[in-house]
Curated annotation (Swiss-Prot):
Coiled coil: none annotated. InterPro entries: Ribosomal_bL20, RIBOSOMAL_L20_CS, Ribosomal_protein_bL20_C. NCBIfam families: rplT_bact. One of its GO terms (molecular function) is rRNA binding. Belongs to the bacterial ribosomal protein bL20 family. Gene3D superfamilies: 6.10.160.10, Ribosomal protein L20. Keywords: Chloroplast, Plastid, Ribonucleoprotein, Ribosomal protein, RNA-binding, rRNA-binding. The gene is rpl20. The keyword ATP-binding does not apply. This is Large ribosomal subunit protein bL20c. Binds directly to 23S ribosomal RNA and is necessary for the in vitro assembly process of the 50S ribosomal subunit. It is not involved in the protein synthesizing functions of that subunit. The lineage of its organism: Eukaryota, Rhodophyta, Florideophyceae, Rhodymeniophycidae, Gracilariales. SUPFAM superfamilies: Ribosomal protein L20. It is found in: Plastid, Chloroplast. It comes from Gracilaria tenuistipitata var. liui (Red alga).
Amino acid sequence: MTRVKRGNVARKRRKKVLKLAKGFRGSHAILFRTAKQQVLKALKYAYIGRKNRKRNYRSLWIVRINAAVRPYGITYNEFIKQLKNSSIALNRKMLSQLAILDHSVFKTILDSCTPGFK
């Protein structure tokens, strides 16, 4: 059997994991074995968090649009249906931004897609 020298490789691998674990509390930032476990867990949580962020923003946009159309006597659901029927291609993020920042443009969109709800 030949001798396998992998000191550099092992050190680089450990340093990489410990660098990712920087800022963790206690032994999770110092000991390689626990740091490795915590890094894997943190990466898993980060992945889940990226998915949840998209979900949260979409629900926030829906709430904002609903709050903007309610004073005109229409619900969010009816508004989206009327948008689809009048083939206005604006996504929820854009509609939410218009409702907050440029209310007059949002009102014209509302009037153009819902003529019966005035």
